Regions:
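Conserved SAM/AdoMet-binding glycine-rich loop
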Residues: 2-5, 196-308, 314-316
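Glycine-rich beta-alpha loop elements in corrinoid/cobalamin-binding modules
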Residues: 7, 18, 30-131, 343, ...
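Flexible glycine/acidic-rich beta-alpha junction loops that bind and position SAM and/or redox cofactors
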Residues: 82, 168-171, 205-220, 280, ...
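Catalytic cores of alpha/beta
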Residues: 82-89, 257-259, 317-333
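Canonical Radical SAM [4Fe-4S] cluster-binding loop centered on the CxxxCxxC motif
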Residues: 153-190, 197
Length: 433
C-alpha cells in the first residue's frame, strides 16, 4: 500500500514522526511539503493551522483523492475541533490528538467505532470515538524528506521534539490542551540517534521545541537541570553549538546552570513568551508569570551573556489602551535584542477561542476599526497595535534600527495578513460553535 504524507509548506516534525511510524510498519510511505494531487492509496494531511481548513489547494487535493477512490485522513493540531475539519474538508476521518498509535489502526482497518481517537461522518452524523491514547515516547526514526536542508523555520531546518506537555496553561496556547500539562520526555539516547539521522539527511541547524525547552525530563513540575544540560551538550556534540538553538523558555523555568548551558551549547539566544506588559492582561491570558518575573529573567540572561528575544500578543479581548501602553513601556525598558509581535489568535480548543466566542464583535479588537494615528491605513485596532509595536520595538533595540520604507511596508503587510487570517479563523469558529 502506498501512503503520501503532506504537511503544507513546512514539513513539521509531527508529520515526519507519523511518516516514520507508517514506514516502520512496512508501508511504502513518502512525505512532502508540496500540496499536490497524489496517486497514493492513502493521503494523510498533517495540518497545523486553522488557515489550512480554508486552503483551496488542500480542498482540491482531498477532492481529487476521493474522486479517484483513494482514502484521505487529516491529523495535527487542527484536530482540536474535528467538526470544523470534517465540515470544511470532508476527509474520510480525522485523527484527534496524538496520532502515532491511532494512525496505524486507521490505515489498516479504516474508520471504525473501535478505534479510539478518531472522528468521521456516518449517515450524516459525526462519530467521535473518545480521546486518542497518549503516544509512547519511544518511536521509530522520523521519515525525513530529501530536501529537509532547504527548509527554514525561524532559522532552523527542523524543530525536534524532546518532550511533550507543558506545565503552563496559557489561554491562547494549544500545547497543554493537545499534549497535556504533565511532561513526558524522550530518552537522550533516542534524541541523539535522531539528531544524527537529521544531520546525515542534510540538516544544518536544529532547534528544540516542546513549549519550554528546560522542562525536558522534569517530573511533577520540577525541572531536571542536569538532564537538560546533558541534552544540550549531546546535541551540540553532534551538530556544533552554532547549529543548535533552544529558544522557547518560560521566564520561571530558568536557573543559572540552565542559562550557562544555553550560552555554552547553543547559538546563545533565549526566547521568552512575554506577551504583555500589563499584569491584568497576563492574568486574563492565564500566563502564570508577572511582569517583575519577566524583568528579572531578562536581567539574568544578560548577566549570563545571552541575547534575549521576546514575543508579545496584542489585541487580546479586554486589552485597553492603558494595557497596550504598558506593553510599549515594557519593551522600551527591556530593550530586547529581538521582538516578535502577534495579534491574538483564537486557536480552536483554547480558552481564548471560548472567550472570543463569548463576546460581541464590538468588544473584539480584531473587528474594531482603528481611529487613531494609523486611521488612513484602514487597520483594525488589533492590527494597528501590532503595527505600532513592531515599529516601537525597532526604536528600542540595543542596536538602533531605522525603519525605512521597505520595513514599514513589510510590517504593514504582515499585520494585514495576520488580521485577515484571524478574521477568517474566527468566522470558522463561529460557524461551528
Ligand atoms: S508556557 Fe509556552 S508552551 Fe506552555 S502553555 Fe504557555 S505558551 Fe504554551
Amino acid at each position: 500500500m502506498r501512503i503520501k504524507v503532506i504537511s503544507p509548506d513546512i514539513v513539521t516534525y509531527g508529520a515526519m514522526v507519523i511518516g516514520g511510524v507508517l514506514e516502520q510498519e512496512g508501508y511504502d510511505t513518502s512525505i512532502s511539503r508540496v500540496i499536490e494531487d497524489t496517486d497514493a492509496d492513502i493521503l494523510i494531511l498533517s495540518l497545523y493551522s486553522t488557515q489550512h481548513l480554508l486552503d483551496t489547494r488542500i480542498k482540491k487535493a482531498i477532492r481529487f483523492q476521493k474522486e479517484r477512490g483513494g482514502r484521505c485522513y487529516v491529523g495535527g493540531p487542527v484536530s482540536a475541533d474535528p467538526s470544523m475539519v470534517l465540515g470544511e474538508l470532508s476527509p474520510d476521518a480525522v485523527v484527534v490528538g496524538e496520532g502515532e498509535i491511532t494512525i496505524s489502526r486507521l490505515v489498516l482497518e479504516g474508520p471504525s467505532p473501535d478505534i479510539p481517537g478518531i472522528a468521521y461522518m456516518k449517515e450524516g452524523e459525526m462519530i467521535v470515538t473518545g480521546s486518542s491514547p497518549p503516544s509512547p515516547m519511544t518511536r521509530p526514526l522520523p521519515l525525513i524528506p530529501p530536501d529537509i536542508g532547504d527548509q527554514n523555520i525561524r532559522g532552523a531546518n527542523v524543530y525536534i521534539e524532546t518532550h511533550r506537555g507543558c506545565v503552563g496553561g496559557c489561554g491562547f496556547c494549544q500545547v497543554p490542551r493537545y499534549f497535556g500539562q504533565e511532561v513526558r520526555s524522550r530518552s537522550i539516547e533516542d534524541i541523539l540517534t535522531e539528531v544524527r539521522a537529521f544531520k546525515d539527511a542534510g540538516v544544518h541547524r536544529i532547534s528544540i521545541s516542546g513549549g519550554t525547552g528546560s522542562l525536558f525530563a522534569s517530573q511533577y513540575g520540577r525541572m531536571n537541570v542536569p538532564a537538560f544540560i546533558q541534552l544540550l551538550q549531546g546535541i551540540a556534540g553532534v551538530m556544533g553549538p552554532k547549529n543548535l538553538s533552544s529558544p522557547d523558555i518560560r521566564v520561571d523555568c530558568i536557573t543559572d546552570e540552565v542559562l550557562d548551558a544555553i550560552r555554552d551549547y547553543t547559538i546563545g539566544w533565549v526566547f521568552f513568551g512575554i506577551e504583555s506588559g500589563s499584569e491584568g492582561i497576563l492574568k486574563k491570558m492565564r500566563k502564570g508569570a508577572t511582569v517583575d518575573q519577566v524583568r528579572e529573567a531578562v536581567k539574568r540572561c544578560r548577566m549570563h551573556g545571552l541575547k534575549v528575544a521576546g514575543s508579545f500578543i496584542v489585541g487580546y479581548p479586554g486589552e485597553t489602551a492603558d494595557d497596550y501602553q504598558m506593553t510599549k513601556d515594557l519593551i522600551e525598558e527591556l530593550a530586547l535584542d529581538d521582538v516578535f509581535v502577534s495579534v491574538a489568535e483564537p486557536i480552536p480548543g483554547t480558552p481564548l477561542a471560548d472567550l472570543v466566542l463569548s463576546i460581541p464583535q464590538e468588544e473584539n479588537p480584531v473587528y474594531v476599526p482603528h481611529t487613531g494615528e494609523y486611521q488612513a491605513l484602514g487597520l483594525s485596532e488589533a492590527e494597528a497595535r501590532a503595527f505600532d509595536l513592531m515599529l516601537h520595538a525597532d526604536l528600542h533595540k540595543p542596536r538602533f534600527t531605522m525603519t525605512d520604507d521597505r520595513t514599514f511596508n513589510l510590517y504593514l503587510e504582515e499585520v494585514r495578513k495576520q488580521g485577515s487570517d484571524i478574521l477568517r479563523s474566527t468566522e470558522v469558529l463561529l460557524r461551528y460553535s
